[in-house]
Design a protein with these regions (language model features):
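Nudix hydrolase/Nudix homology domain
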Residues: 2-8, 75, 112, 120-123, ...
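Acidic, metal-coordinating catalytic segment for phosphate/diphosphate chemistry
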Residues: 12-50
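Acidic pyrophosphate-coordinating catalytic loop
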Residues: 15-20, 70, 116-127
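Active-site-adjacent beta-strand/loop module that shapes the phosphate/pyrophosphate-binding cleft
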Residues: 23-34, 119-139
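Conserved hydrophobic "DFG−1" position in protein kinase catalytic cores
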Residues: 29, 51, 64, 131-132, ...
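Conserved Nudix-box catalytic region and its N-terminal flanking loop in Nudix hydrolases
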Residues: 41-43, 50, 58-97, 139, ...
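Conserved beta-strand segments that form the floor/walls of ligand-binding pockets within enzyme
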Residues: 63-64, 78, 98-100, 111-112, ...
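Internal catalytic-core helix/loop-beta-alpha segment
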Residues: 86-114
Length: 180
């Protein structure tokens, strides 16, 4: 088996846009067929956190949010999440912060479930997914108009999995978190 990356060398990036969080670069690479360029979105990455609660009988439920997503121009049901936009902040601390901001919860235990690349054909972004356990309620600290307008859903895990199966939940980080 040959290495599909063999013969590719990243030569240079030229920034063509710098936004509040992301930048867009034109990357130049050598390839087995010659020099190529690719548009790449550079991102600090993100976190998602799945709060799991248990009733007295041990039946699990999850806490999801529904918020407007401007890129899709509609509301999306998803796990609490956010960008890793605080330089030097530990990803688990980012997950804990997002849990408080979006659903007003504090987790006694945060466990890293997985890290994935949501769209490796266009961005270097990675998303780290955490499981939040032993959660208690605290004051919600919404940041921005989307979070202020978001709705919180407490659902039995089985119902959330049904929403994945039906396609009502289609956000990648949420599907991954619920199926893990």
């Amino acid at each position: 088996v040959t290495d599909p990356a063999e013969g590719f060398v990243h030569l240079d990036d030229r920034e063509v846009h710098s936004g509040r969080i992301w930048s867009v670069v034109v990357g130049q690479f050598t390839s087995p067929g010659g020099v190529i360029t690719r548009d790449i979105v550079r991102s600090p990455g993100s976190v998602g956190v799945l709060p799991v609660l248990f009733d007295p009988e041990g039946v699990p439920s999850v806490v999801l949010v529904e918020q407007y997503r401007p890129a899709l121009d509609r509301a999306v049901i998803e796990i609490p999440a956010g960008m890793r936009d605080v330089p030097g902040e530990d990803p688990a601390a980012t997950a804990a912060r997002e849990l408080t901001e979006e659903v007003g919860m504090v987790a006694s235990r945060l466990e890293h479930l997985t890290t994935f690349s949501p769209s490796p054909g266009m961005t270097d972004a990675t998303t780290m997914v955490f499981l939040a356990l032993d959660c208690t309620n605290t004051q919600r600290a919404a940041q921005g108009p989307e979070e202020e307008a978001m709705i919180t859903h407490h659902l039995p895990l089985a119902d959330a999995l049904g929403l994945v199966e039906s396609g009502a939940i289609h956000d990648a980080k949420t599907v991954i978190a619920l199926l893990m």
